[in-house]
């Protein structure tokens, strides 16, 4: 009999090519311009600590931080925790920005999230020995990782979570858990997620021992995991992350932010697909499924159901479970199919790289009130200022120390935030609150662009009958009002407030047409309320044109 033919294999260059295309695709996906409001908080605080060689206590950036009384029992503790729990991350972020500029920051972010996806796929590859299962796991992780593509220290948390996962899977150099947690617990408070991994793998080893099948390295695992847990307390807050997680649930300020809302479960999404799909696979493969995978799944799925910001955990555990237990793909992919896979990935890579949002190595300057800040500096204005929450971080970076913030994203004062909410959302109560704080300057935009809601304070200020506030500056991003304009500054007519709202919404639609609700709220709320039917019709038409793209 003739010898059996050798199995056909793909050329040696194909897999490296596929890996390169996948990495380039992910880098392109995660490299949009710098636009997150909280980025500037980390840069400003990091710069201050780097220059002053101390933690930012007392707070140097907001003039309202220590006003009023606490609203819930742990508020002072939470404030102290928020001021110092990510000090190392903020300094490192500042140094990246100072050394590499916007390009360095964008590329660092893209590299961190790409590595998060890549290590997830690598763990699957180590488990299965299957190249394509690992690759698909990395791409599946990317579907959810897009939601964290912001310039915040938490991107390093998710990267370190996968690094820890790899250490626990390899079981080599478990001692690395100790320096990992020392670094991590000073970089960002998300290191508590690493404790979940320690618990899952140690729990698996303990259950195996009870079953009479002890793992060979269980003592080493327990020792270094315990030391890793203790190392998480080597930071300025010690083990403050534990009570802080409960304290956050008491805060109206935290719970008003979208990222702390529960994720919608009535919409099709990659999150639901990965969460439910991985559970189905666990049940289907229950005889093979590792106890650690069950424990990680229920812990991270539970966290993800509590807040949108935790959905990313499913981006790691979902692909890990799915592609660890589904049949290996390489066994069924013939060389022709592997070439087709590479061709498909090439098309996807080309689309990602040529996307308008790929490799935007810049700041989304259109979102920030640079013109208004220049006006304040030009006229040496440093009176107590009321600003919108979304701009607080940027003002810390660009307007401090001349102006300090009323509120910003650090969530430091609950009573001040509630007063802020009254001013921005309820114009009938606004003047009394502004008088209470002695505010002399208002720096405003017209909308909360995620929902499109119009800040009602603008409606009050557009009323010609109110004379306390004068419009002194307006462009397509911001408006500045003052009680007493400086010499040489001629107030603008109140009607220009509405012109400012129109200009802001038009500019937003040009840059971010996927969020067109400012046009909707002008058309179906503000202008009908003011009796301006022609303007209302115009903005409804703009909304329908943009929404229908």
Where are these regions (language model features)?
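Membrane-interface transmembrane helices that cradle and orient dolichyl/undecaprenyl
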Residues: 161-175, 279-288
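Transmembrane catalytic cores of multi-pass membrane glycosyltransferases
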Residues: 50, 189-287
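C-terminal luminal/periplasmic domains and tails of membrane-associated envelope-modifying transferases
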Residues: 357-363, 367-390, 400-404, 411-549
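Signature aromatic-anchored transmembrane alpha helix within multi-pass, membrane-resident enzymes
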Residues: 225-229, 320-354
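Transmembrane-helix motifs of polytopic, lipid-linked glycan transferases
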Residues: 107-127
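Membrane-interface alpha helices of multi-pass inner-membrane proteins
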Residues: 26, 141-145, 165-167, 175-189, ...
């Amino acid at each position: 009999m003739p010898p059996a033919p050798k199995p056909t294999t793909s050329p040696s260059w194909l897999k490296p090519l596929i890996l390169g295309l996948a990495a380039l695709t992910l880098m392109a996906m995660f490299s949009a311009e710098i636009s997150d409001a909280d980025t500037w908080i980390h840069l400003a605080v990091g710069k201050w600590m780097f220059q002053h060689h101390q933690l930012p206590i007392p707070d140097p950036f907001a003039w309202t931080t220590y006003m009023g009384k606490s609203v819930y029992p742990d508020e002072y503790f939470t404030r102290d925790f928020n001021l110092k729990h990510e000090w190392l991350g903020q300094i490192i972020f500042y140094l990246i920005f100072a050394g590499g500029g916007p390009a360095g920051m964008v590329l660092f972010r893209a590299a961190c999230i790409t590595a998060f996806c890549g290590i997830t796929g690598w763990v699957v590859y180590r488990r299965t020995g299957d190249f394509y299962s690992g690759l698909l796991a990395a791409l599946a992780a990317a579907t959810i990782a897009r939601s964290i593509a912001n310039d915040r220290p938490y991107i390093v948390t998710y990267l370190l979570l996968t690094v820890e996962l790899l250490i626990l899977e390899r079981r080599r150099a478990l001692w690395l858990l100790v320096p990992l947690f020392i670094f991590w617990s000073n970089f960002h408070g998300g290191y508590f997620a690493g404790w979940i991994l320690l618990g899952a793998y140690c729990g698996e080893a303990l259950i195996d021992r009870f079953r009479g099948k002890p793992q060979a390295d269980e003592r080493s695992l327990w020792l270094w995991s315990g030391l890793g847990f203790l190392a998480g307390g080597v930071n300025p807050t010690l083990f403050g992350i534990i009570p802080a997680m409960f304290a956050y649930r008491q805060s109206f300020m935290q719970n008003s932010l979208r990222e702390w809302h529960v994720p919608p479960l009535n919409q099709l999404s990659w999150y639901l697909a990965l969460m439910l799909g991985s559970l189905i696979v666990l049940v289907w493969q229950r005889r093979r499924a590792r106890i650690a995978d069950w424990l990680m799944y229920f812990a991270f799925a539970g966290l993800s159901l509590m807040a949108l910001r935790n959905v990313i955990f499913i981006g790691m555990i979902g692909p890990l479970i799915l592609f660890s237990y589904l049949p290996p793909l390489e066994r069924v992919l013939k060389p022709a199919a592997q070439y087709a896979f590479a061709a498909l990935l090439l098309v996807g890579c080309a689309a990602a790289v040529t996307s308008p949002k790929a490799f935007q190595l810049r700041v989304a300057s259109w979102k920030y009130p640079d013109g208004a800040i220049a006006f304040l500096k030009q006229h040496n204005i440093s009176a107590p200022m009321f600003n919108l929450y979304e701009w607080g971080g940027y003002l810390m970076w660009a307007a401090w120390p001349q102006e300090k913030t009323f509120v910003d994203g650090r969530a430091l004062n609950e009573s001040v935030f509630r007063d802020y909410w009254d001013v921005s959302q309820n114009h009938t109560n606004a003047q009394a609150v502004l008088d209470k704080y002695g505010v002399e300057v208002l720096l405003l935009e017209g909308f909360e662009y995620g929902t499109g809601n119009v800040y009602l304070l603008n409606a009050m200020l557009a009323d010609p009958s109110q004379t306390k506030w004068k419009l002194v500056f307006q462009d397509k991003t911001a408006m500045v009002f003052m009680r007493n304009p400086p010499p040489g500054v001629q107030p603008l007519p109140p009607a220009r407030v509405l012109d400012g709202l129109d200009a802001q919404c038009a500019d937003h639609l040009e840059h971010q047409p996927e969020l067109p609700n400012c046009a909707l709220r002008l058309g179906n709320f503000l202008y009908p309320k003011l009796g301006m039917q022609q303007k209302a019709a115009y903005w409804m038409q703009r909304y329908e044109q943009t929404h229908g793209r």
